[in-house]
């Protein structure tokens, strides 16, 4: 496994491969990340992973400085998973003095995570675009857990004619339903016991949908009701949206819907979603 830190090194290393699967990460890897790597390994002759905690996607009062990091552990996991190339740039390598070009999708900033975290998707789209230009993968793998991110990346690839296939991998969950996230490490034991309420709320709405309910407001109410059973859970938003535009739905049509939510447990903010088809 080759580990590189500069863009020039990454490009030289990339030249050794024909087809390449790519998994961009912020490190502190868990089984969800490894599921992306496993899928890439199954579909591509070589796999690259990036580890970069991207400052431009964090707001001024968010957790950039304390975001968990453990590069040695990450590298051991990636080597065991059969990864060929790991790119670990510094902030200065990715954003040198004078950097001033960003990828912006105004529509993404108006809804869900974009509305809750101003500037977040400007940072996400910009760093993913840069990584695609540096690594030039054949396919790139993203988790369904970050549903809006997958929509943003797919639109960017389409709009900017970036020659990469985007592959979305289902969310990996704990046995009690909690979606795997690097931020779960912040949860106290009491918060961790309460956190599966997100999954229960989504599942309850999905069951109502399966039984024939098509009202967006009814399904939002179902999710809020389940969340209200957990005193530690403070919902930031609860959404029933179109799966492509992410606009809120009054009635769910033939294209289905994306159920999603952001919930705070004191300082810890968790997101989760469920795709209704």
Swiss-Prot record:
Signal peptide: none annotated. ATP binds at residues 26-33, 143-146, 172, 180-183. Beta-alanine binds at residue 57. Gene3D superfamilies: HUPs, Pantoate-beta-alanine ligase, C-terminal domain. InterPro entries: Cyt_trans-like, Pantoate_ligase, Pantoate_ligase_C, Rossmann-like_a/b/a_fold. The active site is at residue 33. GO terms for molecular function: ATP binding; pantoate-beta-alanine ligase activity. HAMAP family: PanC (MF_00158). The lineage of its organism: Bacteria, Bacillati, Chloroflexota, Chloroflexia, Chloroflexales. (R)-pantoate binds at residues 57, 149. This is Pantothenate synthetase.
């Amino acid at each position: 496994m080759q580990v590189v830190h500069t863009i020039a090194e990454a490009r030289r290393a990339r030249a050794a491969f024909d087809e390449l699967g790519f998994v961009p990460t912020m490190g502190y890897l868990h089984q969800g990340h490894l599921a992306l790597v496993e899928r890439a390994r199954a579909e591509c002759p070589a796999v690259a992973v990036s580890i970069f905690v991207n400052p431009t996607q964090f707001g001024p009062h968010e957790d950039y400085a304390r975001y968990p990091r453990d590069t040695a552990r990450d590298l051991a996991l990636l080597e065991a998973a059969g990864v060929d190339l790991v790119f670990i740039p510094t902030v200065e390598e990715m954003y040198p003095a004078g950097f001033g070009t960003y990828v912006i999708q105004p529509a993404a900033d108006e809804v869900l995570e974009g509305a809750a975290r101003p500037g977040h998707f400007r940072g996400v789209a910009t760093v993913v675009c840069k990584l695609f230009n540096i690594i030039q993968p054949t396919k790139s793998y993203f988790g369904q857990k970050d549903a809006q991110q997958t929509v943003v990346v797919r639109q960017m690839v389409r709009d900017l004619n970036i020659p990469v296939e985007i592959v979305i991998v289902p969310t990996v969950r704990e046995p009690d339903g909690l979606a795997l996230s690097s931020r779960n490490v912040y949860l106290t034991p009491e918060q961790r016991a309460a956190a599966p309420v997100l999954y229960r709320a989504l599942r309850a709405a999905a069951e109502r949908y399966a039984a024939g309910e098509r009202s967006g407001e009814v399904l939002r109410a179902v999710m809020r009701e389940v969340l209200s059973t957990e005193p530690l859970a403070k919902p930031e938003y609860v959404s029933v949206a179109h799966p492509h535009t992410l606009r809120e739905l009054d009635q769910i049509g033939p294209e289905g819907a994306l159920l999603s939510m952001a919930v705070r447990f004191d300082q810890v903010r968790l997101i989760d979603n469920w795709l209704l088809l």
